[in-house]
């Protein structure tokens, strides 16, 4: 399981870079709320994460159902973190770091035991 988590984390680094760049563009160029910026960054990055983890981490096929399960769960998590950040007036960098940490752990557990549970 540690080996899988290391692979998931490696892909997560690239995913995080994608998410952070989009988040920054939304906040500083488009002047959106943190909730919208976090969700938009998520939407762009989650597809990369899903397909890369399916192929390289879990060696599983990609299906519409798996994609919807993954995107749905991670999307809800993204909105919750963004909403909480707006309510607490957190600086954007704190929002990004918080979401990155939470989504790494929760995303791995959810992927391993729900989305890709049948993968060999």
From Swiss-Prot:
Entry-linked InterPro entries: Glc_translocase_bactprenl-link, GtrA_CellWall_Glycosyl, GtrA_DPMS_TM
Any Gene Ontology CC annotation: host cell membrane
Domain of life (superkingdom): Viruses
Protein name: Bactoprenol-linked glucose translocase
Predominant location category: host cell
Family assignment from sequence similarity: Belongs to the GtrA family.
Keyword Membrane: yes
